[in-house]
Design a protein with these regions (language model features):
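C-terminal and inter-domain tail/linker signature
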Residues: 1-141
Length: 141
């Protein structure tokens, strides 16, 4: 049975390596739009550069799909990304909205995740300020 392009796209993310990034060429549109809390790019080369940058800056990034929902031209994914940075394993939970055209090619991919709790809180100065503000503003049970 032939895989749909969205299935190929998801499989590529779940098995992504620096050498497999080039495989996006066959399943994304030339003018794909991508955004996440740190990036907003348009175009296939810029899209692939996001992932080359990821492999350059974190160790052993892995994606795991936790849940998904599809309709005719859109898929929503709940995912977990794990990687090593800041001297330990990091885990980020997020959601993606992926849109595709009539032929199944991906036209946009928008990631939504909590960058404050996922990344910034682990930075010494920002983490200290955030934890201090939680003591002030969080309701105690």
């Amino acid at each position: 049975m032939k895989k749909e392009p969205i299935e190929k796209y998801i499989d590529l993310f779940c098995n992504l390596t620096i050498s497999s990034i080039k495989n996006f060429d066959d399943i994304v549109e030339d003018n794909i739009e991508f955004s996440d809390p740190f990036n907003s790019v348009k175009g296939k080369e810029n899209f692939k550069n996001i992932f080359y940058h990821m492999f350059k800056n974190v160790k052993n990034p892995k994606f795991r799909i936790l849940d998904h929902s599809n309709n005719k031209r859109r898929t929503f994914l709940k995912w977990e990304m794990s990687f090593y940075a800041f001297k330990s394993k990091q885990i980020i939970i997020g959601m993606s909205e992926i849109n595709y055209n009539k032929t199944g090619k991906i036209v946009s991919h928008h990631d939504y995740w909590d960058s404050l709790n996922g990344i910034f809180i682990k930075l010494p100065f920002i983490g200290f300020l955030y934890k201090a503000s939680l003591k002030i503003f969080s309701m105690k049970n």
